[in-house]
Every structure is written in C-alpha cells, then in structure tokens.
C-alpha cells in the first residue's frame, strides 16, 4: 500500500479523522484580529494598521479567499503584486503590509480553524521580490550650526515671532534636549527641576481615533496628553545645560508677563493642539529667520548627530534619546551635513596619511 491508500484505510476505519474545513475569509479573520489588537496595542498603532489594510488589502482578491485555501504561493502572489503593482514601496511600508498577512494567518492558526496550514514564512520572504523595494526618497540632513545659532539669536534675544514666543523658545531649546515633538508638546513646569538641572520625560501628546465595540472609528481624531511614552526606555531625565536653563528662565518670564496659568511650556494663550502648533510655528520661524526649512524631527536627529560628532558613546546618546537599543540610534538618527566638504577633507588628510614627493610616496622615496 502507498501512503494515500493507508490514509484512506485509516479514514474508513475511523482511525484517522479529517478536520472540518471552516469557511472563514481572510477579511473576516482580519476583523477578529484587529478587534483583539485594539485591546493590547496603542490606539495610534491600530490607526496605522487600519490605514495600511484599507490601502493595500481592502477590496483585493486576497481578502476574499478562505484562509483554509491560502498557501505560500497565494501569499507570495499577493505581496509581489503589491510591490510591483503599486511601485515605490519602501522597506518600512512593506514591513507594515507583511505584518498584516503574517499576523492574521498566524492568528487564524492560533484559533485552530479547520484546514488552516502552518506557513513557511522564511520561504515567503525568499520569493517576494524585496529587491524592488525603494529607499525613502527623502534624505534628512543635520541642521547646520550657523542656522542653529541664528535661530537661537533671533528667537531668544530678538523675539522674531512674538505671537508664538513660547512655542519658538521650546523649539530652539529642543536643540539641547533632543525630545520627540509629542514629548516636547506635553512638557509642563512640573517636569522641570532647575535645582537638579534636569527635565523629566514621562508623558507625550498622542493622536488617535476613538473606536466602538466593533473597532469602527467614532468621530474625529482625538489629541490628548497621556501619562505614557513610546516605550519603557523613553522614561528618562535629560540634564540641562546652562543655555537650556537660560531659555527656560526666558520662558518663565514670558509666561509671568502674560499672566498664563496654563502649565504647558509651549502654551501661547490658546488651547490648541500643541504638536500641530509646534509644526506650523517651526515652518514660519524658518521663513522669518531666513533658514532652510527642516522638520521638528530633524531637530531631534541633529541633537544625536552633534553628540555623536563630539565623541559621546552611542549608548549614552541612545539613553538621552529614549531608544531601546543603539542600532536604532546609529541607523536612523546620525545624519550627514549638507555641506560637509571641509570636514570630510580633514578626516581624509588624517586617515590617508601617505604622501607623495615628486611622484613617489614618502615610504618609497626612502627605498634603495
């Protein structure tokens, strides 16, 4: 007897049972998985998952398939179709697309649905054309020292943008702190300890949709300050340099002069969404100061880049940034300068120290 005949014999004698195939589509399992995720991950992470699903999965042939009928070939076909069909998919975006397929099918297996196979995800990654993924076309550069000094002078001393003085002072102070914009927006005077010369980071401003019991959005996006941070490593204390203390003193003088009772450092007389207000303020501030525009996140990256250039160990930089590992810091936060010719030339002179004399190197000139 061959294997098939043995199996048929086992089935007919009741020794081998055939699992009942359950007719559940990928879309149905995704909904169950998404409802489960709402209770275990942050709301803004759920929003990102939903956006990715709606863009690449919703309405596709893939989500209409019964999960019991899906195999590696189907997953490869779908993911390849996304990469090739959409074009210009970055590695970061693809990781979000892949995460949904992987997590939903693993979840279906966890539910012990009849007929759902155990997928070989390593094989799937091998056959998906990840070589066609593109690098992020936008490249950040560190803010030049001259631009930073110009911004500091025009904000702190000249009050270039008086209507948004609090926001402007917070933005330029962040060159000494390296905070995420949500952390900067949520800073209050209770977080500032001028006696010990530290700022304590333990909360952030978030944005996310409220959802009902079915996982559907309820109303507009909600902005809120939460006693939480991105990761457990983000709870930290940042030492204050004398320059940062000076800016804080200027900020306190401004709040006292205006009679502000609000505790937020970036408060400018109106209860606005502070993250959005800081973003808009920076755009105008760059224009008023005649410097090339950069984002609030580039301030954070410039902070890390300048500390790295000073010789600070990456472990310490990661601690100040609130990163869980040094790889994140080194891979994503150490930038180049747009105009770095002289710096590169200096390092090349120092490192490539073999010289020519009349067409010969120093070493060969001494050979006999």
PLM features per residue range, with description:
Residues 12-15, 27-88, 107:
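Basic/aromatic-enriched alpha-helical hairpins
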Residues 196, 209, 216-235, 327, ...:
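C-terminal secondary-structure termini that scaffold catalytic or DNA-interacting sites
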Residues 68, 128-154, 210-241, 259-260:
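DNA breakage-rejoining catalytic core of tyrosine-based enzymes
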Residues 104, 145-149, 239-291:
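Active-site/catalytic core of tyrosine-dependent DNA strand-transfer enzymes
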Residues 191-198, 293, 312-334:
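Short, polar N-cap/turn motifs at the start of nucleic acid-interacting alpha helices
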């Amino acid at each position: 007897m061959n294997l098939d005949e043995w199996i048929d014999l086992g089935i007919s004698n009741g020794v081998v049972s055939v699992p009942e195939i359950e007719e559940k589509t990928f879309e149905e399992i995704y909904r169950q998985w998404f409802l489960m995720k709402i209770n275990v991950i942050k709301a803004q992470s759920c929003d990102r998952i939903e956006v990715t699903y709606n863009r690449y999965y919703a309405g596709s042939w893939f989500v209409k398939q019964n999960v019991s009928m899906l195999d590696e070939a189907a997953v490869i076909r779908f993911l390849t179709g996304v990469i090739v069909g959409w074009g210009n998919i970055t590695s970061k975006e693809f990781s979000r697309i892949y995460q949904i397929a992987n997590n939903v099918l693993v979840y279906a297996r966890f539910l012990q649905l009849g007929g759902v196979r155990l997928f070989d995800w390593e094989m799937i990654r091998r056959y998906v054309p990840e070589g066609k993924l593109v690098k992020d076309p936008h490249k950040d550069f560190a803010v030049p020292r001259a631009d930073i000094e110009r911004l500091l002078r025009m904000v702190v001393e000249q009050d270039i943008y008086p209507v948004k003085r609090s926001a402007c002072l917070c933005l330029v102070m962040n060159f000494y702190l390296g905070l995420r914009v949500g952390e900067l927006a949520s800073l209050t005077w209770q977080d500032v300890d001028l006696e010990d010369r530290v700022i304590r980071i333990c909360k952030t401003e978030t944005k996310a949709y409220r959802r009902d019991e079915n996982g559907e959005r309820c109303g507009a996006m909600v902005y809120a300050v939460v006693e939480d941070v991105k990761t457990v490593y983000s709870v930290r204390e940042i030492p204050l340099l004398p320059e940062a203390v000076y800016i804080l003193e200027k900020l306190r003088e401004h709040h006292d002069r205006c009679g502000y009772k609000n505790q937020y450092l970036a408060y400018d007389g109106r209860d606005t969404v502070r993250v959005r207000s800081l973003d808009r303020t920076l755009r105008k501030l760059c224009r008023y100061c005649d410097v090339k525009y950069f984002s609030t996140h580039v301030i954070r990256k410039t902070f890390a880049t300048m500390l790295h250039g000073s010789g600070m160990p990456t472990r310490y930089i990661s601690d100040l940034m609130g990163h869980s590992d040094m790889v994140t810091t080194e891979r994503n936060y150490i930038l180049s300068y747009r105009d770095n010719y002289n710096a590169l030339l200096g390092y090349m002179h120092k490192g490539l120290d073999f010289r020519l004399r009349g067409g010969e190197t120093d070493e060969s000139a001494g050979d006999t």
